[in-house]
Amino acid sequence: MKLITAIIKPFKLDEVREALSSMGVQGITVTEVKGFGRQKGHTELYRGAEYVVDFLPKVKIEAAVDDALVERVIEAIEGAARTGKIGDGKIFVYDLEQVVRIRTGETGAEAL
């Protein structure tokens, strides 16, 4: 089992959610986050003064998936989140040692 974490542009969330849902991913966790990478933020004009915005709004998506789905999930996220411009985001894949469904006590892949 793997935990796939993707940091994407907020306006791409619906497309990514639909792509994951259509391939059978049962659930995701979404968190609003801020960060920066190579784009290093940007300058905004507010009431005649320039301000540097260091952290850009992003969305973090987390999905626990069976090993057999990992490559397909990565491809789905890449395809749905890509704009071809800087700041499209990153995908991280972590090993999951254990998953427990609290309500039923199911463990492992059955708990996904």
Language-model-detected regions and their locations in the chain:
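Positively charged, small/polar-rich N-terminal and surface patches that mediate targeting and assembly
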Residues: 1-112
